[in-house]
Each structure stands twice: as structure tokens, then as C-alpha cells.
UniProtKB/Swiss-Prot annotation:
InterPro entries cross-referenced by the UniProt entry: Antirepressor_Ant_N, Phage_P22_antirepressor_C
Function description: This protein prevents the prophage P22 c2 repressor protein from binding to its operators and also inhibits the action of other prophage repressor proteins, including those of phages lambda and 434. The synthesis of antirepressor is negatively regulated by the protein products of the two other immI genes, mnt and arc.
Organism per entry: Salmonella phage P22 (Bacteriophage P22)
Protein's name in the database: Antirepressor protein ant
Keywords (A to Z) from UniProt: Transcription, Transcription regulation
Record flagged with keyword Transcription: yes
Length: 300
């Protein structure tokens, strides 16, 4: 714990959520969440979760904050910024936890961030207006699980697609009538890709030279992502301030890079590589077609 930053809380509050309380603190204008109460509330193992938080402290900005705990005694509490809470929550796969805590985990994933955010921005905690039950959203979660498995996405990325498509901040805000539409949308993404869908094939309007430039740019982004992944373990080992950025740049853009690949493939189907002004970076085109990412020496 010596390498963990220690901060002094300016203001602490217990925010009610799901019949329990979540301990929060304000430090230098940033809202933090005490993690042990959250872990205990859900029913997870604190020992395993604190190990993950310590191992990935740069990603989650995990710090110790001197604050008044539940027993009214002042002590150091391990915390992460509120804005990082969803990232941690969605790092836990509901299908891999005990059945008796699965629904509670899902409820935290879908609602907790919004409740805490409302508290610190509006001065009061309000549960989002419920439109569907956890059981009613089960088919959608199953579809998301399939999307994550088939497309190798992270859960926040998969849920973000639904949020953007239906203009909501969480799937809990979906109307009951929207659930089947969301499930159909996710299934279509799994089968056909988000930007391909069932649309009629359009004539390519890019020249071979223009297409080559975009493919080259995609290839640089793809290989840069792999480079950041390679750098992260070394940066973390020397406790570099850049380790967090290396982790983020190595992981957070994978979804966009994948979407860009789908768009490029869809718009370059008719490109003749034998044209005089055609592709010159053939290796980049091969990596695009094969969805190739340079191999990593590390496992993430």
C-alpha cells in the first residue's frame, strides 16, 4: 500500500442505494467512491477485488483517502473516482459470479453510477425511473454476452452501442417495447457488423489511392494499439506516470478500430489493387482483411 497515493477527504457522504449505503467523498473537486462498502454490498470477495484494484491502480486511479468510515472512526479507505466506477463494475462478468449475487451485481452495473452522479451534481440521489425489471432485461443481457464473446469487446463498449442507438444512459431506461428491438439490433451486429447491416450494397465512391491512405491510417492505429499494450507492463513496473495512458490507449480504442475496419472493408470491396493509383501498402491491406493485430508477449 506504500505506493498508493493518500488523500484527505473534504466532505464524505453516505448515499442510499438499493436499500444499502455507498460511502463517497469529495477531494479537490473530484467525487470518489469507497470500494470496500460497494464490494461488500454486492457480495463479492474483497480480497480478490482489492488485488485487482492494486494491480490496475493506474487504470482505476485507486487511492487511499483518510475519511470517516461506517463505524464513525477515521481511517484510510481505498477509493476510486466516481467516473471510474462503471469501468470497474463492468469488469466483472455477471455470468461468473455466484447466482445469489448476480442480480445485485447487475443492478449496480445498471443504476449505481447514475444515482451517485445525481447526488454529487444535483444534491440528491434519485434512482432512475424504472421502465423494465431485471428479468425483462435478461434477453438483452444474454445478447450482450454473445456480442462480447463473438466480437471480443469489453462490456462497457457493448453497452455503449445500445446507449447510443437508443439514446439512453443505461439499459434500465429502455421501455419494455424497446427490449426486443435492442436484442434484434445486437444480434444483427453479431451476425453482420454494425455498419453493414441489411442495407443494399452501395457503389464504392473512393478512389484506390484514397482507400489506400485510409487503410494505411487504420494500420497505424491498429499497430499503435499493440505497441501501447506492449509498453504497459514495463511502464507499470517502473511506476511511470504514463502507465495509465499506455493501458488506456492499448485497450479503449479497440472497439473504434474494429468499427473502422468494418467501414473500410465495406467501402473498399470494389477497389482494384492493380489500378495505377491503387494501394501501395499491400501488407496493411492484408492486415485489414485478416483483422490481424501484431502478437503480444503478454496476456491481458
Amino acid at each position: 500500500m506504500n505506493s498508493i497515493a493518500i488523500l484527505e477527504a473534504v466532505n464524505t457522504s453516505y448515499v442510499p442505494f438499493n436499500g444499502q449505503h455507498v460511502l463517497t467523498a469529495m477531494v479537490a473537486g473530484v467525487a470518489y467512491v469507497a470500494m470496500k462498502p460497494v464490494v461488500d454490498n454486492i457480495g463479492l470477495s474483497w480480497s480478490s477485488q482489492v488485488q485487482k484494484l492494486l494491480k490496475m491502480k493506474d487504470k482505476f486511479n485507486y487511492v487511499d483517502i483518510d475519511m470517516v468510515a461506517g463505524d464513525m472512526k477515521k481511517r484510510l479507505m481505498g477509493c476510486i473516482p466516481l467516473k471510474k466506477l462503471n469501468g470497474w463494475l463492468f469488469s466483472i462478468n455477471p455470468e461468473k459470479v455466484r447466482a445469489d449475487i448476480r442480480d445485485k451485481l447487475i443492478k449496480y452495473q445498471e443504476e449505481c453510477f447514475t444515482v451517485l452522479y445525481d447526488y454529487w451534481t444535483k444534491g440528491k440521489a434519485e434512482n432512475p425511473r424504472k421502465k423494465t425489471s431485471v428479468d425483462e432485461r435478461t434477453p438483452l443481457r444474454d445478447a450482450v454476452n454473445m456480442l462480447v464473446s463473438k466480437k471480443h469487446l469489453m462490456y462497457p463498449e457493448a453497452y455503449a452501442m445500445i446507449h447510443q442507438r437508443f439514446n439512453v444512459e443505461s439499459i434500465e431506461e429502455l421501455e419494455a417495447s424497446q427490449i426486443p428491438l435492442a436484442v434484434e439490433y445486437i444480434h444483427r451486429v453479431v451476425l453482420e457488423g454494425e455498419f453493414i447491416g441489411k442495407q443494399e450494397k452501395k457503389t464504392n465512391d473512393l478512389s484506390a489511392k484514397e482507400a489506400n491512405s485510409l487503410v494505411w491510417l487504420w494500420d497505424y492505429a491498429n499497430r499503435s494499439q499493440a505497441l501501447f499494450r506492449e509498453l504497459y507492463p514495463a511502464m507499470r513496473q517502473i511506476q511511470s506516470n504514463y502507465s495509465g495512458k499506455c493501458y488506456d490507449y492499448g485497450h479503449e480504442f479497440s472497439y473504434i478500430i474494429g468499427i473502422a475496419r468494418d467501414v473500410l472493408i465495406n467501402h473498399t470491396r470494389d477497389v482494384d489493387i492493380n489500378e495505377p493509383d491503387g494501394p501501395t501498402n499491400l501488407s496493411a491491406w492484408m492486415r485489414l482483411k485478416d483483422k490481424e493485430l501484431p502478437p503480444s508477449l503478454h496476456r491481458y
